């Protein structure tokens, strides 16, 4: 049974269904930038443009550390409606696989209106343990490789850069960032 007390389908035949262990999270990307370290000529002080415009978009992501496969959507909000869209699209992307997905306990992950597809099973990591969710390091990588020391003139430019940076992630990079021996030994 799942957390709502409803029957969940069992994996019909493990030899014919691929089981994936994926880790899911969301992160905000917006027009508020954070200056990072940078190179500059000796004896000079670096100058980095900065502004504080509170406009955001949210990247929803799921990664599979064993293979380095990943799935991302950029959404306007962090809420149950967007989470339902994410789960539906993830399920459509892997229709013949059974996905066991670890995630934090955000309110929209446990909402009564959350629609969990039949080929996805959710489980929650303990509160205040981001180190147990390897996708957290993917967000750091995206910020470091796509958002350092730059201002964006519009929210659309933020989304463009976010999509470009996500598309630059390959399986080997995702695997190297999300590799945890305790995950791989469990799979």
Whereabouts are the PLM-identified features?
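Short functional hotspots at interaction and active-site rims
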Residues: 1-187
